[in-house]
């Protein structure tokens, strides 16, 4: 949950692109932990997204909403890190923050089931 705190810190400072980056990484770390716990290999960020979808969303173990949250954060992080004209605002961060926390909680629940 430290990475969520980093997102909050960046949000408070007005660094919304950085906040979205930290929200993504908080979810990425949680998703990676789930995959590792289940001995599912993923070597890239795209691989984590693909494996999560294939093994958990498509099988119904993870809601479509959580899958969509991770995909949206993946896209926003890509854009904010690699595009010259990407702009995240407070409204976006405020929308994504609770969704990211819910995603992380879902990862934790799935890990504890295994």
Please annotate each region the language model reported.
Residues 1-114:
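Terminal alpha-helical segments
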């Amino acid at each position: 949950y430290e990475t969520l705190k980093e997102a909050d810190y960046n949000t408070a400072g007005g660094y919304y692109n950085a906040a979205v980056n930290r929200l993504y990484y908080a979810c990425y770390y949680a998703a990676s932990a789930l995959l590792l716990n289940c001995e599912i290999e993923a070597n890239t960020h795209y691989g984590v997204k693909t494996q999560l979808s294939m093994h958990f969303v498509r099988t119904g173990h993870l809601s479509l909403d959580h899958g969509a949250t991770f995909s949206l954060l993946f896209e926003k992080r890509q854009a904010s890190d690699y595009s010259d004209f990407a702009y995240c605002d407070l409204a976006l961060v405020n929308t994504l923050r609770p969704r990211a926390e819910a995603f992380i909680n879902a990862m934790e629940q799935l890990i504890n089931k295994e």
